[in-house]
Amino acid sequence: MLVVFQRVVRATVLVGRKDTIRTVKTHSGAKKRWILTEDGKSFKRKHAGAQHLNRDTSSSTRARQRQWEEANTIQKRVLKRLLPFK
């Protein structure tokens, strides 16, 4: 009986010894939270904490939570490593 296994190979990186190869994968948490901007140079995300229990917060706080937040310089550097295929 022939069994075929499908493997998702994205990219390979040599690590340490020559016979050790590690697959580069996208960080799934970052993939769900960050999207690439229209110009393709930065990332943006929504604010956390705007889903429920907002009755006692001010209208300016709720309006600020509806806006998009752009990644700063350090976050961009980390996101390039976490999201290698974007």
Curated annotation (Swiss-Prot):
Coiled-coil annotated residue ranges, if any: none
SUPFAM superfamilies in UniProt: L35p-like
Keywords: Mitochondrion, Ribonucleoprotein, Ribosomal protein, Transit peptide
Positions of the UniProt region annotated as Disordered: 45-69
UniProt GO cellular component terms: large ribosomal subunit; mitochondrial large ribosomal subunit
UniProt main location, coarse: mitochondrion
Pfam families: Ribosomal_L35p (PF01632)
Location in or out of the cell: Mitochondrion
Domain of life according to the entry: Eukaryota
A Gene Ontology molecular function term of the record: structural constituent of ribosome
BP terms from Gene Ontology: mitochondrial translation
Transit peptide boundaries: 1-18
Family: Belongs to the bacterial ribosomal protein bL35 family.
Quaternary structure annotation from Swiss-Prot or TrEMBL: Component of the mitochondrial large ribosomal subunit (mt-LSU). Mature yeast 74S mitochondrial ribosomes consist of a small (37S) and a large (54S) subunit. The 37S small subunit contains a 15S ribosomal RNA (15S mt-rRNA) and at least 32 different proteins. The 54S large subunit contains a 21S rRNA (21S mt-rRNA) and at least 45 different proteins.
Function: Component of the mitochondrial ribosome (mitoribosome), a dedicated translation machinery responsible for the synthesis of mitochondrial genome-encoded proteins, including at least some of the essential transmembrane subunits of the mitochondrial respiratory chain. The mitoribosomes are attached to the mitochondrial inner membrane and translation products are cotranslationally integrated into the membrane.
Name of protein: Large ribosomal subunit protein bL35m
Phylogenetic lineage: Eukaryota, Fungi, Dikarya, Ascomycota, Taphrinomycotina
